[in-house]
Amino acid sequence: MNGGHIQLIIGPMFSGKSTELIRRVRRYQIAQYKCVTIKYSNDNRYGTGLWTHDKNNFEALEATKLCDVLEAITDFSVIGIDEGQFFPDIVEFCERMANEGKIVIVAALDGTFQRKPFNNILDLIPLSEMVVKLTAVCMKCFKEASFSKRLGTETKIEIIGGIDMYQSVCRKCYIDS
């Protein structure tokens, strides 16, 4: 075995996916692995680099397609990817990198604000050695939240935003609103 594998961190908005991604990458850095993180370049809510909703920043390459950063990451053994659901080539990229012996850690939404699947992320599940689904806290009733709900009437899937545009909600609060 070459040691390459895929770790997938999924869940709704505000569940700590990016924070967990950063935590895992930092663990590998402490162990002297060469690490790189990649963020979706259209996500510029807080500035350059990878940002958590609580304003923690981590250095990251930016791309809209992962194949565009292949040359830049050849010397790294750990690759962290944030907002994985937005990369059209996420499945092929992760499988290739893991097969080449790299550790790939992906943080992504598993469902849209309409509770429809991000199919590219679901396609990663059978290819991943580790899958963790995080929950958030329902912003209406304060129970466990597994879903993201968009505020407003916009129906386009790729609308990048934070607490101003989305809430994490439980099943009951999703259905009731």
From Swiss-Prot:
InterPro entries: P-loop_NTPase (IPR027417), Thymidine_kinase (IPR001267), Thymidine_kinase_CS (IPR020633). One of its GO terms (biological process) is thymidine metabolic process. SUPFAM superfamilies: Glucocorticoid receptor-like (DNA-binding domain) (SSF57716), P-loop containing nucleoside triphosphate hydrolases (SSF52540). Keywords: ATP-binding, Disulfide bond, DNA synthesis, Kinase, Metal-binding, Nucleotide-binding, Transferase, Zinc. The active site is at 83 (proton acceptor). ATP binds at residues 11-18. It comes from the Viruses. This is Thymidine kinase.
